[in-house]
């Protein structure tokens, strides 16, 4: 059976047993901040097992995509060198949430594995383990299923503590837990290894293929196990492992799924498919990289993005080792889509995006890979001992982009280890330097501790009546604020929007009789809205009634920019792809700023497309609609949620243009898209690896921006004595004239240099049979000096030349050595000395070198180094 057929058979079997087929969840866990990546089938059902979520079904079956690289579960360094380690794998699983338990779970597993209708595995090849004290499971296996006692193994606490066992599963120190039973396949006596629980169990003969976890206890902090009222079942069977069994091969890399990827990798690299470890690395890594990118991860220097970058660069290095020339990794994506795109449609829909991301990352790493490998080879050649120093590992990481595990891979091939502690010391020193170079403002919310909650009334109002429930000055609770004092006012209700979701807090004022408190900003801590500002007049006490007034003009302008941000987000996903995710935003009354995930600069034509799409939606003048609903209903409607954001039971869904933009948002918005008027993008750039930023203006600010641009065009036209209509032609003519003048200037400089060369050649001194010339030619640039040195080398014959100049307040140096002398004297060595003398750096080839510095006063002394340099070298 092919891997795809096995997957479908598993899902279909359990559907026939009353299970609901559930699609694989994203590799980015949406409900578990403790996980870097989804690494088991049960991850998406965690809240069901904990009793915190009720679903419409109590039986489920899935084929879950999983990644184990980085974090606690990290298989990266073993991938390619063993038969079964992968960064990406599929976990087939069936689950019961308080429905069936041990008897049915065991029977289902045995039937699927051994029935001639399904996998038809020989029963005598299967071994079973149970937890040592789980007599119930043991009896079901032996008395009901019929597994003979000689193929049953009880596994006790083999990890040094109570319930610390390969056959006892825990979610943590406390919480749901229970025994498990595992099914092993015997690959035959020709492979070394013993049954589970034996001294030889680490061999490859007996391989675990299915694990059934029985969650029947809740462990409390005192270590006591209490029976759960509704026991559950969590099972997992690796698709790759069971495919190897059914296809009669021992290594996962020999199954049909991997053979197509290995062939594609070999073709892309230009090598033969001969099962080399490096080829296996590439074939494995294309799966994890392809799926991670499809799920929205982009290469970066932190978190999930850095794990992806490590995997990509490890694949690139192994391809390089096999002789790959240029970018190759992205070329394997098509084979991945052909193999797995049917089961996982996200691969098909995002194939082009995955290829672009991989190619861009390959090209970026290629700039430093070869140079970094040379540096590492030099360091290893000079190494005394078997440990690569931490500072070397750090240099490769910091300067050449080598993740530590990539350097570790290379070291491992030489039977060397890394000084990981030394590397961590270097990393910490860098972090300390970064912290000391940064300054952080104080979070004034952290100073204010408020137990009250404020009712927000600002969605439909900018003014109202309220009561002061708390006052703070310098973070301390006070009963009164006096005129001129800065402080924080907390009200029982307010129309002031508190800073959230990138939208700035409202400003305005509070009026209490003759007292007036000017609100400069509004923030939120817990359920309390904090009005920050200064008491401009009178005094204000706790309990006082106040009239609230938001600055409606600022609020209105801010709301337009916020709505425009939503339209821009939707347009970005249309133009660039659905991988675009919001990474941050700032919305105020003057402009909007939007940070989003993307791997390359946006092209001018894409900027235009974004503006066209957004402005088309603005011109449609559709209503901006809001709806309060639960999170599941919102997601079913296609509402985009910010990843990592925590949402309550009730969420606010904001829609524009029907389904053009549907997002969860609690901010203040326009009434209709037409209110925005116009959007104009003013800048686009990168702010971090894999994160781009767009800044834009709307409405009156956009009109002002365009008017200013119009004035600049008029001014430019005046400068070239033209008009707006013929400005391009006039500018082209000016640039062409400038080009001709520069060419004439170069010709004149060349003539002058030639004349100077004739004069300078007569100044050359003879040092041990070598013509030595050091001269100062202020005002000449580096290009002119290079031409002159070439000319002098031809005229002087056997010669060493150093020319210097002060040009535009900087020192320029050029050194030349005729080729008959480069075995003894090198221009680069002379340049290093001379450049250092003027406070700079330099280098180059043995026959020609360039450099410079900042200390013009030291130029003569630098030139004087030439004769001693020759005397010492000859």
Curated annotation (Swiss-Prot):
It is an enzyme of class 6 (ligase). One of its GO terms (cellular component) is cytosol. InterPro entries: aa-tRNA-synth_II/BPL/LPL, Ala-tRNA-lgiase_IIc, Ala-tRNA-ligase_IIc_anticod-bd, Ala-tRNA-synth_IIc_core, Ala-tRNA-synth_IIc_N, Ala-tRNA_ligase, Ala_tRNA_ligase_euk/bac, DHHA1_dom. Zn(2+) binds at residues 562, 566, 665, 669. Coiled coil: none annotated. Its main location: cytoplasm. Consists of three domains; the N-terminal catalytic domain, the editing domain and the C-terminal C-Ala domain. The editing domain removes incorrectly charged amino acids, while the C-Ala domain, along with tRNA(Ala), serves as a bridge to cooperatively bring together the editing and aminoacylation centers thus stimulating deacylation of misacylated tRNAs. This is Alanine--tRNA ligase. It comes from Pseudomonas fluorescens (strain ATCC BAA-477 / NRRL B-23932 / Pf-5). The lineage of its organism: Bacteria, Pseudomonadati, Pseudomonadota, Gammaproteobacteria, Pseudomonadales.
């Amino acid at each position: 059976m092919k891997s795809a057929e096995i997957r479908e058979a598993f899902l279909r079997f359990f559907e026939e047993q009353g299970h609901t087929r559930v699609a694989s969840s994203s590799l980015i866990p949406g409900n578990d901040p403790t996980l870097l990546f989804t690494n088991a089938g049960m991850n998406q059902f965690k809240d069901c097992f904990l009793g915190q979520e009720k679903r419409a079904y109590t039986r489920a079956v899935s084929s879950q995509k999983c990644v184990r690289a980085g974090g606690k579960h990290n298989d990266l360094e073993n991938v390619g060198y063993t038969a079964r380690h992968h960064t990406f794998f599929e976990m087939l699983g069936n689950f019961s949430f308080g429905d069936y338990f041990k008897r049915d779970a065991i029977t289902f597993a045995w039937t699927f594995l051994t029935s001639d209708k399904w996998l038809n595995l020989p029963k005598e090849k299967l071994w079973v383990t149970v937890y040592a004290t789980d007599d119930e499971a043991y009896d079901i296996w032996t008395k009901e299923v019929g597994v003979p006692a000689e193929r049953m193994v009880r596994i006790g606490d083999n990890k040094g503590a109570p319930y610390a066992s390969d056959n006892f599963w825990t979610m943590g120190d406390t919480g749901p837990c229970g025994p498990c039973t595992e099914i092993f396949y015997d690959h035959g006596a020709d492979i070394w290894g013993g049954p589970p629980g034996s001294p030889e169990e680490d061999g490859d003969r007996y391989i675990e293929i299915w694990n059934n976890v029985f969650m029947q206890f809740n462990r409390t902090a005192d270590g006591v196990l209490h029976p759960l009222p509704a026991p559950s079942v969590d099972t997992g069977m690796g698709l790759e492992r069971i495919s190897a069994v059914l296809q009669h091969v021992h290594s996962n890399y020999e199954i049909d799924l991997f053979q197509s990827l290995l062939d594609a990798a070999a073709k892309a690299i230009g090598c033969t498919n001969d099962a080399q470890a490096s080829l296996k690395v590439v074939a494995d890594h294309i799966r994890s990289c392809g799926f991670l990118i499809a799920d929205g991860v982009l290469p970066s220097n932190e978190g999930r993005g850095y794990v992806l970058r490590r995997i990509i660069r490890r694949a690139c290095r192994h391809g390089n080792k096999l002789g790959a020339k240029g970018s190759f990794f992205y070329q394997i994506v098509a084979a991945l889509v052909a193999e797995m795109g049917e089961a996982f449609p996200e691969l098909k829909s995002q194939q082009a995006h995955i290829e672009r991301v991989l190619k861009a990352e390959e090209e970026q790493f290629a700039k430093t890979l070869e140079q970094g490998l040379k540096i590492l080879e030099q360091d290893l050649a000079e190494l005394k001992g078997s440990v690569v120093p931490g500072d070397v590992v750090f240099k490769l990481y910091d300067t050449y982009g080598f993740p530590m595990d990539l350097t570790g891979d290379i070291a491992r091939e030489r039977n060397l280890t890394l000084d990981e502690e030394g590397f961590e010391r270097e990393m910490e020193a860098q972090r300390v330097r970064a912290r000391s170079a940064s300054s952080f403002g104080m979070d004034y919310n952290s100073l204010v501790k408020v137990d009250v909650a404020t009712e927000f009334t600002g969605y439909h109002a900018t003014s109202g009546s309220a009561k002061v429930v708390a006052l703070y000055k310098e973070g301390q609770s006070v009963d009164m604020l006096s005129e001129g004092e800065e402080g924080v006012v907390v009200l029982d209700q307010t129309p002031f929007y508190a800073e959230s979701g990138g939208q700035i807090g409202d400003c305005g004022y509070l009026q209490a009789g003759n007292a007036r408190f000017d609100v400069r900003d509004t923030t939120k801590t817990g359920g309390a809205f904090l009005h920050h500002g200064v008491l401009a007049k009178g005094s204000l006490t706790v309990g006082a009634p106040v009239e609230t007034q938001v600055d409606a003009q600022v609020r209105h302008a801010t709301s337009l920019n916020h709505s425009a941000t939503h339209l821009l987000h939707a347009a970005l996903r249309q133009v660039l792809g659905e991988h675009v995710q919001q990474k941050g935003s700032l919305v105020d009354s003057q402009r909007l700023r939007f940070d989003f995930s993307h791997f390359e600069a946006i092209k001018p034509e894409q900027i235009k497309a974004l503006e066209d799409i957004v402005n088309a939606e603005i011109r449609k003048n559709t209503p901006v609609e809001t709806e309060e609903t639960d999170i599941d209903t919102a997601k079913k409607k296609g509402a985009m949620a910010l990843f990592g954001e925590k949402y309550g039971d009730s969420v606010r869904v904001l829609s524009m243009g029907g389904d053009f933009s549907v997002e969860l948002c609690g901010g203040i918005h326009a009434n209709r898209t037409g209110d925005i008027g116009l959007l104009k993008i003013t800048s686009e750039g990168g702010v971090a690896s894999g994160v781009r930023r767009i800044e834009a203006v709307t409405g009156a600010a956009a009109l002002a921006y365009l008017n200013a641009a119009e004035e600049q065009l008029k001014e430019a036209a005046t400068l070239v004595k033209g008009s707006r209509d013929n400005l391009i032609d006039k500018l082209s003519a000016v640039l062409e004239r400038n080009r001709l003048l520069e060419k004439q200037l170069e010709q004149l400089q060349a003539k002058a240099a030639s004349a100077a060369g004739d004069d300078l050649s007569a100044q050359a001194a003879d040092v041990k049979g070598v013509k030595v010339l050091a001269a100062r030619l202020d005002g000449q640039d580096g290009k002119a000096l290079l031409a002159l040195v070439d000319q002098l080398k031809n005229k002087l014959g056997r010669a060493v030349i150093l020319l210097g100049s002060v040009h535009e307040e900087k020192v320029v140096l050029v050194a030349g050595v005729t080729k008959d002398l480069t075995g003894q004297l090198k221009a680069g060595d002379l340049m290093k000395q001379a450049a250092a003398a003027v406070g700079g750096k330099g280098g180059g080839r043995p026959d020609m070198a360039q450099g410079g510095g900042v200390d013009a006063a030291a130029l003569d002394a630098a030139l004087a180094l030439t004769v001693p340099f020759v005397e010492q070298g000859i």
